[in-house]
């Protein structure tokens, strides 16, 4: 890798996703998952990995008529103080209902993107029989996903619509 490549900022190889695109891709994910659940093709519940998985999970739950929806909050990034986000070890901040989850059988766990796979690896260790689905997947994380729609290169930075305005806008509160 050249020194120019090493100094490239994450957004220099960017993939911008609009609200319309995430909606279409999330519906495509639902279509791919339809009839694949263990209970005569049905899923018992959808669990969104917050925060990025919430919009896709909502769309998947609607399309598949899944009424039981929960979240698991996993933090694996922290703000780099104006620099590109930097990784740290993943940890669960909020877990879904334990009685509902069991070992994950019949549970559909949804996220927007699998990058390194560390977040899904942590969640999969807790719910080994759950089905993991993401809208987008990078090669390093693909082994952690059962179903995804679009593959992107490992060095691509995805700009999701909830992170964007006409230009990047810091959230009102907090950057984690």
Swiss-Prot record:
Cofactor: Mg(2+)
PROSITE patterns: PUR_PYR_PR_TRANSFER
Pathway: Purine metabolism; GMP biosynthesis via salvage pathway; GMP from guanine: step 1/1; Purine metabolism; XMP biosynthesis via salvage pathway; XMP from xanthine: step 1/1
Keyword Amino-acid biosynthesis attached: no
Catalytic activity as recorded in UniProt: GMP + diphosphate = guanine + 5-phospho-alpha-D-ribose 1-diphosphate; XMP + diphosphate = xanthine + 5-phospho-alpha-D-ribose 1-diphosphate; IMP + diphosphate = hypoxanthine + 5-phospho-alpha-D-ribose 1-diphosphate
Binding site for Mg(2+): 112
Binding site for guanine: 115, 158
Subcellular location: Cell inner membrane
Top-level lineage group: Bacteria
Top-rank EC class of the record's enzyme: transferase
Membrane topology classification: Peripheral membrane protein
Documented EC number(s): 2.4.2.-, 2.4.2.22
Main localization (coarse): membrane
SUPFAM superfamilies cross-referenced by the UniProt entry: PRTase-like (SSF53271)
Record: residues binding xanthine: 115, 158
Residues annotated for 5-phospho-alpha-D-ribose 1-diphosphate binding in this entry: 51-52, 88, 111-119
GO biological process, one term: purine ribonucleoside salvage
Keywords carried by this UniProt record: Cell inner membrane, Cell membrane, Glycosyltransferase, Magnesium, Membrane, Metal-binding, Purine salvage, Transferase
Family matches, as HAMAP family: XGPRT
Family: Belongs to the purine/pyrimidine phosphoribosyltransferase family. XGPT subfamily.
Name of the protein in question: Xanthine-guanine phosphoribosyltransferase
Organism of provenance: Roseobacter denitrificans (strain ATCC 33942 / OCh 114) (Erythrobacter sp. (strain OCh 114))
Phylogenetic classification of the source organism: Bacteria, Pseudomonadati, Pseudomonadota, Alphaproteobacteria, Rhodobacterales
